[in-house]
Amino acid sequence: MSSGGLLLLLGLLTLWEVLTPVSSKDRPELCELPPDTGPCRVRFPSFYYNPDEQKCLEFIYGGCEGNANNFITKEECESTCAA
């Protein structure tokens, strides 16, 4: 195979990697946790990643404890789990 062919193949493989959606294997484990409001009673609008729907959804966080699948913004949730 010529060097031009190798460069083309390398370019196509790179493009395929960039355009391929993230699989559940690539997501941090925290993205698989269920939403957890925690025991406190403050009501903070927050976001969690729902692996079944493959998107970030809003939930109410109580303000303490809970788990790591808890994001202040939808954008933060998406960049961590749905990228």
Curated annotation (Swiss-Prot):
Pfam families: Kunitz_BPTI
Annotated BPTI/Kunitz inhibitor domain residues: 31-81
Cell compartment(s), UniProt: Secreted
A single Gene Ontology CC term: extracellular space
Gene Ontology MF terms: serine-type endopeptidase inhibitor activity
Leader sequence residues: 1-24
SMART domains tied to this protein: KU (SM00131)
InterPro entries with a match to the protein in the record: Kunitz_BPTI, Kunitz_BPTI_sf, Prtase_inh_Kunz-CS, TFPI/VKTCI-like
Gene3D superfamilies: Pancreatic trypsin inhibitor Kunitz domain
S-S bonds: C31-C81, C40-C64, C56-C77
Domain of life of the organism encoding this protein: Eukaryota
Primary location: secreted
Tissues expressed in: Expressed by the venom gland.
Family in the record: Belongs to the venom Kunitz-type family.
PANTHER family: KUNITZ-TYPE PROTEASE INHIBITOR-RELATED, SERINE PEPTIDASE INHIBITOR, KUNITZ TYPE, 3
Name under which the protein is recorded: Kunitz-type serine protease inhibitor textilinin-2
